[in-house]
Amino acid sequence: MNNLKGYAIANDGNMKRIAITYDVIDDETGKPTALNKKTNMFITDASVLETIRQIDAFAQGIIDNQ
């Protein structure tokens, strides 16, 4: 089983990229077999990009009102 530990969304030129950190857990023992594994990829799914745009607008609204 893969246990998501965290992720970050970043601008990379005109694209959005997601960086993910996770642990691999043995299904039978429940013990970790690999810690802090990382992967990243460009986000191309339109619905995911729209969700990110909404979160970006929310975050911008917070700092605009500080």
Please report, for each region that a protein language model flagged, where it lies by residue:
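Acidic, low-complexity intrinsically disordered segments
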Residues: 2-6, 31-66
